[in-house]
Amino acid sequence: MKPLVLLVALLLWPSSVPAYPSITVTPDEEQNLNHYIQVLENLVRSVPSGEPGREKKSNSPKHVYSIASKGSKFKELVTHGDASTENDVLTNPISEETTTFPTGGFTPEIGKKKHTESTPFWSIKPNNVSIVLHAEEPYIENEEPEPEPEPAAKQTEAPRMLPVVTESSTSPYVTSYKSPVTTLDKSTGIGISTESEDVPQLSGETAIEKPEEFGKHPESWNNDDILKKILDINSQVQQALLSDTSNPAYREDIEASKDHLKRSLALAAAAEHKLKTMYKSQLLPVGRTSNKIDDIETVINMLCNSRSKLYEYLDIKCVPPEMREKAATVFNTLKNMCRSRRVTALLKVY
């Protein structure tokens, strides 16, 4: 009720003010004043009241003050104080319209020598009075649903399968490669897959170095070269392990290199064991003493078993480069034997 009483007192206040010299009001200012009076009436009607029927009384035609009468009363309103040089903004809470009108710049009438400064009553701010105005319709804020976060893209990586080294039943040094190996190069992102094979092999790519392919010229690699290559790979692996073993980016490559090294060592041991077995056999009686009959049987059996490929074996172009010197010695010996009369006579018997 206090805000309503204050507003009514403000409306009735100009009648109790003593008469001061009148001022000249322009039509625009008069229109702004009339609009402001209408805004005040709307504010008075929008103030909630505890008494029922209060709003009906304010809307009744018996209202004493009209817009025109209040507009005429504001023409004679003059108050002492500092003049406001800025424009005031009125906001209607119902229609949400904004009206700007000048509050200063009143020109006194011609013929008045005294200059009086006037301040409109609506520019006076009370010190200890607080007015709470409520709109007829409450403001409802629509809560917008928050956008759902996009699911994080899952990074897919090629599966990594470790090789399996199994011992053969015939020899403890021979390894068979049963499961495929799939490695992922971190720098290039290319997966390297090796299909399953039962035959021991030395070809393949490691995560540290891409060695030369052994499958192209297997006869050009002897036992010493293979062991030297394995030692080089082992030294490189040891250097890689000493450099950085805690980095998870290199851990998988190091494990793959270890597996390849184990396979290479096992294959080298199997090859060495096979060579030792061949040296002990009768096919290659090198470095051991034997009787004459055993040597004859060995040579005849070897020539008989390879008789279908003697033409290929006797061609110098098919012999590996490191064995051409020995092959030339054998070929010259055979030529000399074929030219001798003794061998020709012996061959005629057969």
UniProtKB/Swiss-Prot annotation:
Q: Which superkingdom?
A: Eukaryota
The reply on keyword Signal is yes
Q: Could you give a single Gene Ontology term from the biological process aspect?
A: fusion of sperm to egg plasma membrane involved in single fertilization
**The entry's keywords:** Cytoplasmic vesicle, Developmental protein, Glycoprotein, Signal
Q: What is its main location?
A: cytoplasm
**GO cellular component terms, A-Z:** acrosomal vesicle; intercellular bridge; microtubule cytoskeleton; mitotic spindle
As annotated in Swiss-Prot or TrEMBL, what is the tissue specificity of this protein?
A: Highly expressed in testis, where it is localized in the acrosome of postmeiotic stages of spermiogenesis (round and elongating spermatids and in ejaculated spermatozoa) (at protein level). Poorly expressed in placenta and fetal lung.
Q: Which InterPro entries match?
A: Equatorial_segment (IPR026743)
Xref: Pfam families: SPESP1
Q: Which residues, if any, are the signal sequence?
A: 1-19
Q: Posttranslational modification, per the record? A: Glycosylated. In testis there are two predominant forms of 77- and 67-kDa and a form of 47-kDa, whereas in epididymal sperm from caput, corpus, and cauda there are two forms of 47- and 43-kDa. Testis forms contain complex carbohydrate residues. Epididymal sperm forms are N-glycosylated. Then undergoes significant glycosylation in the testis and that the majority of these glycoconjugates are removed by the time sperm reach the caput epididymis.
Keyword Signal attached: yes
PANTHER family recorded: SPERM EQUATORIAL SEGMENT PROTEIN 1
By what name is this protein known? Sperm equatorial segment protein 1
Q: Which organism is it from?
A: Homo sapiens
Which lineage? Eukaryota, Metazoa, Chordata, Craniata, Vertebrata
